[in-house]
Amino acid sequence: MTAFWGEVIGTMLLIIFGAGVCAGVNLKKSLSFQSGWIVVVFGWGLGVAMAAYAVGGISGAHLNPALTIALAFVGDFPWKEVPVYIAAQMIGAIIGAVIIYLHYLPHWKSTDDPAAKLGVFSTGPSIPHTFANVLSEVIGTFVLVLGILAIGANQFTEGLNPLIVGFLIVAIGISLGGTTGYAINPARDLGPRIAHAFLPIPGKGSSNWKYAWVPVVGPILGGSFGGVFYNAAFKGHITSSFWIVSVILVVVLLGLYVYTKSHSAKTLSNSKYI
């Protein structure tokens, strides 16, 4: 099997486990209906671990465009392979989402809430706030990439690394995931969101495209900074990439902060005349 198909299958498995647990929690008449956030984060964490066990020896089990880009910045992955991996991850994520749709086929009609249906496929903020939502994804993915690189630098019992990474996902979900649903992976959010848009889900409502850029841009920025920060802080390698990524991150976050603040002020001003 090629690395391309390894990423397709690995990401498909990740979404089957992750979106599957979200479906079980969100959709009515599921035996795990309303079982809670802890179930969700453990489902995603174990899903990452199982997918990594399945294809780690084939593709390295990136399963995440933000991680692929971060590894390229670190120098552990060739830039020419980045588009191939990202394409594979997107394909796998869409396939995984379609499989979950089919698996829970009779449950869609039993669930009235369009937001609950969308929540099976993609993330959304608990409080819509552009700057804070992007920052949450930046921080979560920064911690993810930093953690993965640190785990990779340590010696564990052979075969234990994927499980440790799975628990890293759980830890991030418990501590940081409550704000945006912690996408921390552009393919994990965008692929299933695309599937949600074209699948014939009864009463599904909007795919919330106005938010879709947040779990793409945030993780890419956070993951990239996590990679160059690890090289600088842990290895002492401060390259031009570190400064480029740092400047882009600061400029984007400052721009979003100013935009969000001005938009909030305008909304408040308009509300006075209602």
UniProtKB/Swiss-Prot annotation:
Mode of membrane association: Multi-pass membrane protein
Residue ranges of the TM segments: 3-23, 38-58, 82-102, 131-151, 164-184, 238-258
Keyword Zinc among UniProt keywords: no
Residue ranges of the motif NPA 1: 64-66
Single GO MF annotation: glycerol channel activity
Motif (NPA 2): 185-187
Catalytic activity: glycerol(in) = glycerol(out)
Keyword Glycoprotein listed: no
Keyword annotations: Cell membrane, Membrane, Transmembrane, Transmembrane helix, Transport
GO BP field: glycerol transmembrane transport
Domain notes: Aquaporins contain two tandem repeats each containing three membrane-spanning domains and a pore-forming loop with the signature motif Asn-Pro-Ala (NPA).
Biological function: Mediates glycerol diffusion across the cytoplasmic membrane via a pore-type mechanism.
Name of this chain's protein: Glycerol uptake facilitator protein
Species: Bacillus subtilis (strain 168)
Lineage: Bacteria, Bacillati, Bacillota, Bacilli, Bacillales
